[in-house]
Swiss-Prot record:
Residues 1-18, 73-85, 166-178, 231-234 are lumenal. It is found in: Sarcoplasmic reticulum membrane; Nucleus membrane. The lineage of its organism: Eukaryota, Metazoa, Chordata, Craniata, Vertebrata. Homotrimer; conformation seems to be controled by binding to diacylglycerol (DAG). Residues 40-51, 107-144, 200-209, 256-298 are cytoplasmic. Channel activity is activated by a change of voltage within the sarcoplasmic reticulum lumen and blocked by luminal high Ca(2+) levels. Disruption phenotype: Mice are viable. Mice lacking Tmem38a and Tmem38b show a weak heartbeat at E9.5 followed by loss of cardiomyocyte viability and embryonic lethality around 10.5 dpc. Residues 260-298 are annotated as: Disordered. The keyword Acetylation does not apply. This is Trimeric intracellular cation channel type A.
Amino acid sequence: MDLMSALSLGELALSFSRVPLFPVFDLSYFIVSIIYLKYEPGAVELSRRHPVASWLCAMLHCFGSYILADLLLGEPIIDYFSNSSSILLASGVWYLIFFCPLDLFYKCVCFLPVKLIFVAMKEVVRVRKIAVGIHHAHHHYHHGWFIMIATGWVKGSGVALLSNVEQLLRGVWKPETNEILHMSFPTKASLYGAILFTLQQTRWLPVSKASLIFVFTMFMVSCKVFLTATHSHSSPFDILEGYICPVLFGATWGGDHHHDNHGAPHGMGLGTQHSGLPAKAKEELGEGSRKKKTKKAD
């Protein structure tokens, strides 16, 4: 018996899975995606000097997952751009966030209670995209588990996976920020979600798709809203990975996460770096510091 049916939530899950995403949920997805684009250093200056490049970056933030999924499945990568309504809606959001007088629109949507609503609605879209991606890949490759997982993963986190391409459009090159090397919570969650939906699609997970969409959406909404409200870069998976990864791989997955140093107290970064140096290097560093002090004294 399906767990959701036993809890009398089957009808709720089914109704929830049938809620149309356009335009309300898609609008929220576009708003949050372009807000994160504006957070990037130099994004505002780029919009003033090179508005076309800024618009392309915004479209990549909004539709990058579709582009990457089409690329994986050998379909035209510009196919989604035939959806004129979504393109116009995303373009309108981009213009209001970057060019609205006095930044009124940006200030309104960034007001934390309002932003949390948009963040929650964005996660609804993310989970639905993962489920649709799995179904679409299953239609082409009935027994291609890895293809289904990969397609669902990029559907849920394609924007992050294309971050280096988006940086190139802004004239920035930071290979150390590769999302594969430093997975954020949405990227990891999309991967785990893609695995769950693949198991459900291939009948290895005995739950209905509507029930899985409902449960996983509630999980994503709860986690992402909490992380956004607390301005945290941590992941709910960190504790579990801390136990499993040392056993399976001999190290903690994502232990060198690029957010880890952000919370370090001021004045401890240099000492931490020095503590990781060999003894000989420490001596050379100390000798160099003494020479500099001597020169200043002279």
